[in-house]
Design a protein with these regions (language model features):
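GIY-YIG nuclease catalytic motif and its immediate N-terminal context
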Residues: 1-40, 47-71
């Protein structure tokens, strides 16, 4: 890991309509709050609140690697 690189988490949440949403974040707690309340939540989850559970699937050094894993999921 190089100096300055962040750890990114790949996560999945279950929405109120029982669908799944995957994403990446550097701060899982903040991201769950954003999905439930904030304007920064994904458009997909804004219409499917509340989001109760978040499962962290893996972690990566660098956003690009995390997004590649998200795409494969």
């Amino acid at each position: 890991m190089q100096v300055g690189e962040k750890v990114w988490f790949l996560y999945v949440v279950r929405c109120s309509d029982n669908t799944l949403y995957t994403g990446v974040t550097t701060n899982p707690d903040r991201r769950l709050r954003e999905h439930n309340k904030g304007r920064r939540g994904a458009k997909y989850t804004q219409a499917r609140r509340p989001i109760d559970d978040m499962v962290l699937l893996d972690w990566f050094v660098g956003r690009s690697r995390a997004q590649k894993a998200e795409y494969k999921f």
